[in-house]
Amino acid sequence: MKKVFYILLFAGMILSGQVMAQNKLNFGLSQPQDKATLPVSSSKPAVALRKVKTANPSTLEKVSDNEFLLSTGWELTDANRLTASGESVFNPKLNTADWYNATVPGTVLTTLVEQGVYPDPYFGLNNLYIPDSLCRKDWWYRLPIKLPENSSGKSVWLLFNGINYKADVWLNGKLLGHIAGAFQRGEFDATPFLKSGGENILAVHIFPPRNPGIPQEESSKTNAGPNGGQLCLDGPTFISSEGWDWVPGIRDRNIGIWQDVRLKLTDGVSIIDPQVIADLPLPDTTSVSLTIKSIIQNTSARSNQITVTGRIDQIEFSKMFYLKPYESRTITLTSQEYPQLKIKNPRLWWPNGYGRPELYKLNLEVKCNGNGISDQKIIRFGVREFSYEMAVAQPDKKMWRIEFNPIQSAGKVLFNNIDRVDMGNGTFVPQLVSSADPSLLTSIDKDSKNPFLTIKVNGIPIFCKGGNWGMDDGMKRVSREKMEPYFKLHKLANFNMVRNWTGESTEELFYDLCDEYGLLVWNDFWLSTEGYNLNVNDNQLFVANATDVVKRFRNHASIAIWCPRNEGYAPLLIEPQLTALIANEDGTRHYQPNSRNLNLRPSGPWHYLSDGADYYRSIAEGFSTELGTPSIPTAATIRSFMPLEDQWPISDTWFYHDLHDGQKDYLRAIETKYGISETLDDFCKKAQLVNYDSHRAMFESWNSKLWNKTSGILLWMSHPAWPSMVWQTYSWDYETFGSFYGAKKACEPVHIQMNLNDKKIIIINTTLKSYKLLTAKLELFDLSGKKLSAKSISTAVPANKLTETFVAELPESAPQVYLLRLTLTDKNKVVSQNEYWRTNEKEGLFDELNQLEAPYLTAKIGKQQNPGKTIIVLSNQGKVPAIGLKLNLRDPQTGKIVLPANFSDGYFTLLPDEKKQVEVEWNSAKISNPEIIVEAYNLKRQGIAMVK
C-alpha cells in the first residue's frame, strides 16, 4: 500500500506541475524524534483532574423565529470506546456516563482540556503530556434534541458551519450525509427522519485526516524543525496544526465540530447564498447602484408562487415569480428594475485610517403562496468598491501599468498567471489572456517601471499596513469575547490589513470583526510554500471548499484579495478552476495568484537585522506580504505561561514556545546594545526597546518610499496563535509591548520620522485630509534631559502623500547616548511625536542607560469619559528622563495585571518636568477601579503616586 501511495503521489505532482526532486519536498518527520532531544522542564509535570460528567440537557437557542443554535447538551467519546461498549450510538437510552460533556463549537482537544482530561497545553511543556494519538482515531458527538413548538408542518434542516476533517451526520439511525474539509458547510433535510414527539438523536461521526504527520518538539537541542509535513496532503484543513515554527503540533489537529450547528425551519422555499454588489460611478461616490443576487430553491413537490422581499434601512422592494417542484432559480435585482436600489450619498465603508467602516444590513425574506416567512437571511455589507493597479506584460515583454476593476470586467478572466513574465529581482507579472478585451482595463503607463500591486478602495489608493495571522487560536477557540480584543488592538496599532495565512482563520466571526474595525483581508486558501510543502491529494475537495468559502463570505466588505496559497502558485489543475471561481462567484475582487513574486516583492527576511537602515537600503519596495523580526513579550506575560523553575535563565520551555535558532542575532543584539541580563525582568525590559526600534524601522522604511513603487507591508506576524516567543505585536493574553507600540508609532495616519539611511526628516500623510501648514521640529537631548539643539520648519502636508522637510544634522560633539525627538504640530497641537534614542558608537551601545537613576513619577486622573475609559496625566518630577515608559492596570484584590487594557502610548520618554496625557480603556464590567502601575527602563514596576 505504501508503494502505491507514493506512486500516486508522484503522479499527482506531475499533473499539478510540481515536478521536482523528492528530497526537496517536506514530508515532515517519518518517526518520532530521539527522546534525548525532547524539551525538559525543571518543574514537575502538571496533573489534570477530570471533571465529573454532568447532566446538561440540550436547549434550542433562538436566533430567529425559524432558526436555532444547537450549542448545549452535546456529548463526546472516542469511537474505540463506543465500539468496545457494544452499544449503539443511536439508542435513546444509551448510557453516556463515561462520555464527556462536549464543547460545541469546539475541537476534540478543547473538550478534553475543558473537562480536565488533559492540562492546559498552552502552559509550560504541558502539550507534551497530551497524546498525539488524539488525531489518529475517530470520535463521536451525540445530541438529543426536541423540535421547537413551531416546527409542525415545516421542513427541518440541520446546518453545520464547520467540522474537521470529515464527518458522517446521522439522525435517529439514518445517515443524512457527509461533510468533507474544514471549511465546507453541511446542510441536510432532516424532515423525513424526525420523530414528531420525544427526543431525536443527532450523532456526528468525526474522521481525522489520513496524514496527520508527526510534530517535531522544539528544544535547545533542536532547531524549529520542518514547517508542517504530511498534513498538507489533506488540505483543506488547519495545516499548521502539525507544527510550524510559531506553534507546536496540536494533538488533535483541530478535529471536531469547530463551528456552530443550527436547526432551521422553512415552509417550502429557501434562500441560498445571496450576494450584494455595490457599484460606485467612480471617481464619484455620491451615489451607488446595488445589485442583489440569490438562488431561490423550491424544496417542495408542488409548484409555488414565490415572493421575495428585501429591506435596507428605509428602502423596500419585492419580486414575485413561480417555481416548479424542486426548481432552483437565480434571481437578480438591479437598480434599473428597482430604482430604489440606487442610493444617494451612501455611507461608505473605508479601511482604518481613511474613514469610518460603515455597514448596511439587507433583510431578505421569502414567502410561499402568500403564507408566512419561509426563509430569511440578514446580510451585512459595505458600500465600497475595489480596484487594483498592477502591471501586465505586453507582447514585447514591456510592462503596461493598468487599473483593473473586477465589477467592470463582468465575470471575465483577464489575466494569464501561468505564462507569466520575469521582470527581475524575484518579481513577475502576468500576461493578458488571448481573449481579454483591453477596453476593460484603464491604462496608466504603457512603459512602466512599477510592477507592484496597489489596492484602491472607492478610487483611493490604500497604503496597506498590517500583519499576518497564522491562526486565530491554536485550538480554534474563537468566540467574539475572546477574539474581538485582538482586532481592536490591530485598529489601535493603526493597521488596515490582516492576512488570513493559508486560510486558517476562515470563519464568519473573523470577517465580521474585520468589517467592523476597517481591516482589509488578504485571504489565502489552504496551500503553503510551493516546492517545499506538499500539494493536496484531493483537488476536487479543495475546490469544493474554496467554492463554498467564496459563496459564503463574499458579502464581507473587508475581503480585498483571494490568494490560492502561501508562497507560490496553485497547482496547474487547480489554478484555472480558482481563477474562474473568483470571476464567476465573486466578480468584485482580484484573484492574486501568488502571495509573493507576482506583482509583489519576494517575502522576508524574518530574522532580526542589527542595522535598521538595511530595511531602507535593500528591502523596502513594492508590496510585501511577509516581513518579520522576533518579538519576545514582557516578563509578566512569560510568567503567566511558564512555571517559575523555567522562567530564567532561558530554558527548554522558551524554545518550546518558539524561541528558535533564527533568533540568535536578536538575542545577541539585546545583550550587545544594553548589556548582559541578570534577571527575567532585566532581560525583557531590554528586549522591549529592541522590539520597538525594529518594528518601527520595518514600517518606517516602507513609509520612506510612499507611492514610489511602494504600496504595502504586512508583518510576519502581528498576531500569535498561542503563548509565543517569536513573531507578534502583542501576546496571546492581549498584553501590548515594544513591538506593538513601535508599529503603532510608525503607522500613524499622519507621522513624522527620520529615515535611518539618509537622516531625512519626512512627513507621511496617509489620510484623505490635507494640512495647509504644519510645523516639524527636531530636538536633541542628553541623558540629563538637557536640550542640546533644535531646528524647525513649517510646510504644507497634502493628503495621501509623503512630504520632505530637511536633513537632520547630528553634531559630532553629541554625547555617546542622546535622544532625538521629532514633533509635528498644527497650531501648537501635537499631531505626531517620534523619539529615537541614538548613540555615537558604531555598534549602537546603550549601556549608559544602565547607570541612570530612577525618575520620580506622579499621575493625575483626568475626567473619566465613561466607565472603563479615562485620561492619565503623567508627570516626571525627577531629575532624569524616564525611558521606555510602560503603563498597566492592576487588580488591587489579586495583584494581577488587568488585560485587555488599551493605552494610547507606551515605551515613550518623559523628560524631567514634562507631562504627558495617556488614554486608557478597559472592561469596567470585570473591574471598576483598577490601580495604575508604571515601569520604565530605569524604573522597576510600581504603583504610581496619585496627586490632585
Q: What function would you assign to each model-found segment?
A:
Residues 351-354, 685, 689:
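Short, conserved micro-motifs enriched in small and acidic residues
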Residues 232, 665-674:
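Active-site-adjacent bridging/hinge elements
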Residues 96, 254-255, 635, 663-667, ...:
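Alpha-helix initiation and N-capping motif
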Residues 7-16:
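Bacterial N-terminal signal peptides
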Residues 15-16, 512, 537, 639, ...:
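Residues in and immediately flanking transmembrane alpha helices
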